[in-house]
Amino acid sequence: MINRIKITIVLLFAVLSASVGKAQEDYRFDIGGGIGMTGYLGDANTANLWSRPGFDAELLFRYLPNPRWGIKTNFYVGSLGGDSAKMTNVFPDGKTFKFSTTFFELGELVEFNFFNYGIGETYRHLKRISPYIAAGLGVTAWSVGGKFGAALNIPLGVGGKYKLSERWNLGFEFLMKKTFSDKLDGAELADPLGIKSSFMKNTDWYSTMSVTISYEFSKRCAACNYKD
């Protein structure tokens, strides 16, 4: 009887050890997608970011060097719009301008997690949830009134991640993106007040606010040295 109890305890310990080991596995990459809302700030909307909200869809691919850092590639397709009739400011001769466009964006972001993000391995103080900050560089393309445009953008923002399970992640992210162009809202609004735009001055902004879900894959080499 005692021997049977010992065998049962040993088997139970082995199963638990295997389960814990599985929960502690690390993965190098993350892939997923999301949907969200967009906003615009420019000549056709100078104050209220979501005066005419649009929508976007997103694909993402993330490299995970360690629990604190992530390097993410994003591809967006979405809509933007603005209407100067809703503004308190007026243009010369009382003109009003309205636009809508579909945009495409490819960007690269560096993310910093405030906590060591992950499941298991208590000695590394992994947290199932973590806020983060992000910054990077991207390129945006659009068409307004049949005229094509493209420009670099600088995305800056914040987000949060939550581990649904060992491999599945739920995320939320808000990014403001400064474009190096004043024609995101159309060539007609490039210089409505006669103030010439430059590479840094009088340029348009837009935002993306997304909910994402992603899946981790490609196990990290167990024999390799891992840097936190």
Label each PLM-derived region with a short phrase.
Residues 22-62, 208-221:
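Short glycine/proline- and aromatic-enriched beta-strand/turn motifs that initiate or cap beta-hairpins
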Residues 26, 64-68, 115-117, 163-165, ...:
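Outer-membrane beta-barrel channels and translocator barrels
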Residues 27, 51-55, 102-106, 129, ...:
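Residues that define the transmembrane beta-barrel architecture of outer-membrane proteins
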Residues 33-37, 57-63, 108-112, 135-139, ...:
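Residues on the lipid-exposed face of transmembrane beta-strands in outer-membrane beta-barrel proteins
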Residues 43-48, 84-90, 121-124, 145-150, ...:
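Outer-membrane beta-barrel translocator domains and adjoining extracellular loop/strand segments
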Residues 67-145, 211:
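Gram-negative (and chloroplast) outer-membrane scaffold detector with strong preference
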Residues 85, 165-228:
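Predominantly the C-terminal beta-signal and adjacent terminal strand-loop region
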